[in-house]
């Protein structure tokens, strides 16, 4: 197994800044904007985006937290985890929602998130913001806002480390098939 640091803390902060600027540019009137972080790492990213957008535009958008455990179609592959509670700041009917996640790969997480959102109202529009797009989609789902497109192989893993969840800041590319020569 090999690990390569793709982004360090400073570069990661730059990606988040770029996402915040793009979202802020598209939503100058924040009254209808709700950022919704997909658990786990999408939640701290949503709060960071809120803080940056508030700095840029003077008003913080609303933030929600979405747990998709029971909406996944791949529960048997990774085992059942204990679900968390979804928390929404308001009814999403008529709102402009930006779903936030750390990495998009096959599109299954986002598909589940879209299904879970139906329980919180009918948004006017739903967009997707991701830190890393690594390709290899199985569903026709594409991010509207993307920090970086990273070329990967399907057997590789992209792992985002955030201080809120991992006590450090970086992005790793992990290749489980690589052999270390001795």
Swiss-Prot record:
CDD domains per UniProt: PRTases_typeI
Gene3D superfamilies for this protein: 3.40.50.2020
Keywords, ordered alphabetically: Glycosyltransferase, Transcription, Transcription regulation, Transferase
Catalytic activity: UMP + diphosphate = 5-phospho-alpha-D-ribose 1-diphosphate + uracil
InterPro entries xref list: PRibTrfase_dom (IPR000836), PRTase-like (IPR029057), PyrR (IPR023050), PyrR_bifunctional (IPR050137)
Motif (PRPP-binding): 97-109
Entry GO MF terms: uracil phosphoribosyltransferase activity
Alphabetical GO biological process terms: regulation of DNA-templated transcription
NCBIfam families: PRK05205.1-5
Chain's role: Regulates the transcription of the pyrimidine nucleotide (pyr) operon in response to exogenous pyrimidines.
HAMAP family: PyrR (MF_01219)
Name of this protein: Bifunctional protein PyrR
Organism: Synechococcus sp. (strain JA-2-3B'a(2-13))
């Amino acid at each position: 197994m090999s690990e390569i640091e793709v982004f360090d803390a400073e570069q990661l902060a730059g990606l988040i800044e770029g996402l915040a600027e793009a979202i802020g540019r598209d939503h100058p009137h924040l009254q209808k904007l709700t950022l919704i972080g997909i658990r786990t790492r999408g939640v701290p990213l949503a709060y960071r985006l809120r803080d940056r957008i508030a700095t840029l535009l003077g008003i913080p958008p609303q933030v929600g937290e979405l747990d998709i455990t029971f909406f996944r179609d791949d529960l048997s592959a990774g085992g059942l985890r204990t679900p968390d509670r979804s928390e929404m700041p308001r009814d999403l009917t008529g709102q402009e929602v930006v779903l936030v996640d750390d990495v998009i790969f096959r599109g299954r997480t986002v598909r589940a998130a879209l299904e879970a959102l139906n329980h919180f109202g009918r948004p006017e529009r739903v967009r997707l913001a991701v830190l890393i797009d690594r390709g290899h989609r199985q569903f026709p789902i594409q991010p509207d806002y993307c920090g970086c497109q990273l070329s990967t192989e399907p057997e590789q893993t992209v792992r985002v480390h955030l201080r809120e969840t991992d006590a450090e800041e970086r992005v790793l590319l992990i290749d489980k098939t690589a052999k270390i020569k001795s």
